[in-house]
Amino acid sequence: MQLSLLVGLVCFSAINAKIYFKEDFSDDDWEKRWIKSKHKDDFGKWEISHGKFYGDAVKDKGLKTTQDAKFYSIGAKFDKSFSNKGKSLVIQFSVKHEQDIDCGGGYVKLMASDVNLEDSHGETPYHIMFGPDICGPGTKKVHVIFHYKDRNHMIKKDIRCKDDVFTHLYTLIVNSDNTYEVQIDGEKAESGELEADWDFLPPKKIKDPDAKKPEDWDEREFIDDEDDKKPEDWDKPEHIPDPDAKKPEDWDDEMDGEWEPPMVDNPEYKGEWKPKQKKNPAYKGKWIHPEIEIPDYTPDDNLYVYDDIGAIGFDLWQVKSGTIFDDVIVTDSVEEAKKFGEKTLKITREGEKKKGKKTKKQKKKEKNEKIKKEKMKKRKRANRKKKK
């Protein structure tokens, strides 16, 4: 009976799961669904490509950036806008930086249904921004930014993104109990509570401005032992003249000046004397500033809620182009997102790693050939100079 009930609940959940948007760029009509922004004339151009290495030539086609040092902006509207109130929100997509990106974004933005995608740009309002961002060795993180009460709030935790040349699946799950989870390649990378990990609300408590540390409060756990005295023979110089040094026979005091032996470390040198430490009988521990509750704090059970979700887009800057985005899904079901992402985690990744190894060998070969050519050029230059 219990097993039948469990199966029934799973089936009910699967039947009631809603997919609000899904895109795998597998047909030629993608340009009808995706709108390129005309806000700037020099936005970077997009193309459909499976890249240099892939698992399946058709299934692994995705949206690729093609021009270096460009801003990119493109988006798609949902068939119908929705609210995530009372249910989970799952955003998932794949990213492949096969160009070995040095600086550039790889994130998506979830937006309202009334957004003008033909005029979208970096300042266009959004609900959620999610995905990897890389710039040099210092920035390799996953952005999770929520818009709340006219402000964009960045996550306070540092989530490291993948920085290799292969495809990776990024998943954000926002739950109706105000919790969240970030997954990379189906594995949990971070999780927690929205209120704790973002500065949506003022703190519940603040330090009491009227509280002061007592003047006689001693935080020193150890103090100098006043009975400990410095030994009389303690003070010795750090360096002394080398006793084994001899003045050279050809040394001329009139010509060379007065000879002085070189200095060596003094084996009797003991350094700065410090008295021994003892337990402080007046030690009270570290003083903790008392806190008070603030009247401005009001909890919000709807931190996770967006009433009008109707579009998704890529709005980013890349120094080195070549990133491929694929397998985009927005749903209320973690299971649906997981099923949709299985292709990426199995077929795509396995095929890429086989062909990617070959590509790495080719790169190494090209690098060695380049070094040989440079050496040949140097030899030719050297021979020309000899002839002259």
Curated annotation (Swiss-Prot):
Q: Where is this region: Disordered?
A: 193-282, 349-388
Q: Which residues form the signal peptide?
A: 1-17
Localisation per UniProt entry: Endoplasmic reticulum lumen
Looking up InterPro entries in the UniProt record yields:
Calret/calnex (IPR001580), Calret/calnex_CS (IPR018124), Calreticulin (IPR009169), Calreticulin/calnexin_P_dom_sf (IPR009033), ConA-like_dom_sf (IPR013320)
Q: Where are the sequence repeats?
A: 189-200, 208-219, 225-236, 242-253, 257-267, 271-281, 285-295
A Gene Ontology molecular function term for this protein is:
unfolded protein binding
Q: GO CC terms for this protein?
A: endoplasmic reticulum lumen; endoplasmic reticulum membrane
List UniProt keywords, sorted A-Z: Calcium, Chaperone, Disulfide bond, Endoplasmic reticulum, Lectin, Metal-binding, Repeat, Signal, Zinc
Q: Where, by residue number, does an alpha-D-glucoside bind?
A: 107, 109, 126, 133, 315
Spans annotated as 3 X approximate repeats = 257-295
What's an example GO BP annotation here?
ERAD pathway
Give the intrachain disulfide bonds. Answer: 103-135
Alphabetized SUPFAM superfamilies for the sequence: Concanavalin A-like lectins/glucanases, P-domain of calnexin/calreticulin
Q: Where is this region: 4 X approximate repeats?
A: 189-253
Ranges of Acidic residues compositional bias?
216-227, 250-259
Keyword hit for Metal-binding: yes
Ranges of biased composition (kind: Basic and acidic residues)? 205-215, 228-249
Query: Spans of biased composition, class Basic residues?
Result: 354-365, 373-388
Pfam families the record matches: Calreticulin
Family, according to the entry, reads as follows: Belongs to the calreticulin family.
| Protein's job | Molecular calcium-binding chaperone promoting folding, oligomeric assembly and quality control in the ER via the calreticulin/calnexin cycle. This lectin may interact transiently with almost all of the monoglucosylated glycoproteins that are synthesized in the ER.
- Know the name of this protein? Calreticulin
- UniProt organism field: Onchocerca volvulus
